[in-house]
Amino acid sequence: MTDPRHTVRIAVGATALGVSALGATLPACSAHSGPGSPPSAPSAPAAATVMVEGHTHTISGVVECRTSPAVRTATPSESGTQTTRVNAHDDSASVTLSLSDSTPPDVNGFGISLKIGSVDYQMPYQPVQSPTQVEATRQGKSYTLTGTGHAVIPGQTGMRELPFGVHVTCP
């Protein structure tokens, strides 16, 4: 013999599930006429690409961006009123940036490493030496930097200047 309470519970559960599914598929309705709210633009996913001396690598790891008040006594000194610090890395590359909120953004400092095959390009974190050494642009949460930096290359003595480019989109 079937327990009638068990049958009622199944029927109520199935009805609730059906109402939930129907509610999720129906568009919202309103008694007010007029256009609905415009669809929001999808935000770009966090990403970073680094280029050193013609070699390009897309970083597959996490991109972290943190904005805080600029610290004039930091080394290197931070310009603007806010500083965005960007860190992105994976097994083959890493990027560390300090960018001001100026328009266009000032680059307070940068560090880049990129391993391509047996060559390991290392630009230790360094301040920008001149206004034309590194140029940056910002569009929304995306930054593009191009310039030259002092790099150490294993197997070579001393540091040398290398061209680089970075494109990063913050989350």
From Swiss-Prot:
N-palmitoyl cysteine lipid attachment residues: C29
Lineage: Bacteria, Bacillati, Actinomycetota, Actinomycetes, Mycobacteriales
Protein encoded by which gene: lppO
Organism of derivation: Mycobacterium tuberculosis (strain ATCC 25618 / H37Rv)
InterPro entries tied to this protein: LpqH (IPR008691)
Pfam family, one: Myco_19_kDa
Protein name, per record: Putative lipoprotein LppO
Keyword list, A-Z: Cell membrane, Lipoprotein, Membrane, Palmitate, Signal
Superkingdom per UniProt: Bacteria
Broad class of the protein's primary localization: membrane
